[in-house]
Curated annotation (Swiss-Prot):
The gene is repSA. Pfam families: RepSA. Keywords: DNA replication, Plasmid. The keyword Ribonucleoprotein does not apply. Essential for pSAM2 replication. It comes from Streptomyces ambofaciens. One of its GO terms (biological process) is DNA replication. This is Replication initiator protein. InterPro entries: RepSA, RepSA_streptomyces. The keyword Oxidoreductase does not apply.
Amino acid sequence: MPDTLLDPTTLGDLLRVASAPDYARWEDQIRRTGAGANPIHLTGWTLHKDKTTGETLHHYTTAVEPGGRLRLACGNRRASRCPSCAWTYAGDTYHLIRAGLAGDDRRDIPATVRDHPRVFATLTAPSFGPVHNRPDHGTCRCGTRHAPDAPELGAALDPTTYDYAGAVLFNNHAGQLWQRFTTRLRREIAARAGLSRRELPDCLRVSYGKVAEFQKRGALHFHAVIRLDGPEGPDTTPPAWATVALLADAIRAAAAHSYTSVSVPAAEDQPARTFRWGTQLDVRPVKAFGDGSDITEQAVASYVAKYATKAAENTGTLDRRIGELSELDRHDVPDHTRRLVEACKMLDPLYPERRLWAWAHMLGFRGHFSSKSRRYSTTLGALRQARADYRAAQEHAALALDDREPDTVLVLADWQYAGHGHTPGESVLAATIARNLQLNRETAREAVRDQLDQEGVAA
């Protein structure tokens, strides 16, 4: 329960929910959603009948549920909107990325991908002007040694000269810049192997999984796992000449090549711009187990999963679309971020096809925060389906339907959307349940770590 006092309306609603005769069932529904902040409400029914005899095998209706509704998880990936669903999304992303690094027989990804050349690369945005930072040595250019959580970190040293328009236009075109980078990367690999671009697919494929991250200054950069496979994907071995060193060298060359650029035409008072990656490029080999010099599979997967649930909120912007600039006042948006949002508003009529104002809450970025090439790994959809199939199998076993042939059972259903979210009192109770679930997860993780440590000592 929260430490602060509840207002009378919330307290009264909380007591109403907690004292209801069907509270236990309501709590069970909330736990099944992961105690999400914004559950989806459905009304309706489902009916299982024997096709031959017409016998009713099972009948379910939401009429018997609390409030006459069934509550489901909202599925929002953003931690700022629904920590519970974001936790599930992060877990799926972790398994997706790690399967592409270590293999997963359940997903038809062989463990031999561990022997393929793999690197973890970070491509950053160029500079749009000096900002307050915290260098490893010395002080910021403003003369201050900023604290790690200083609010001014990432803000422009001189807002009058900072290129806010360039920053949001870069974010807006970052997806295209990534596409050109991957195209150039294949050409660089082919050149180092003495092959033409058309000959390369007969010998090798480039696979990747990536995630976008906003720096405090509001500029986007990409973290990517890049892997070299044989011509048929992860099931085939890449040629002997395809090494980690060759891949790393090709990445650096592709990022720096003039082809890897995106041009934006001039419009009214805005000059023509050509965007390229920043000079801070990091390429690190990925190893199965760490020896202190390379990044490990688990570390990479955890890092990517962490940022898959975030957007631009770490800059202080909103986590939803902005209707009017006045909304920024109500949410105490920092000045630097506000100027980036205002730049989106100002540039929108100059570049209408880029829909900058519609994506102002993302500081201009309009792509997917996490994405992958087709053959890198499994898909998020496949992971969700596996979870749904598991739950369906549990239900069938509980209802004694698993002994019947699927084609002998007729399933009828009718579902209607009935709203979303919690009442004030439900929100407080759900938040308490969510904290308990999170504590249980943390306790379980600590227990697993202790067990692994003990097994390591015993070995």
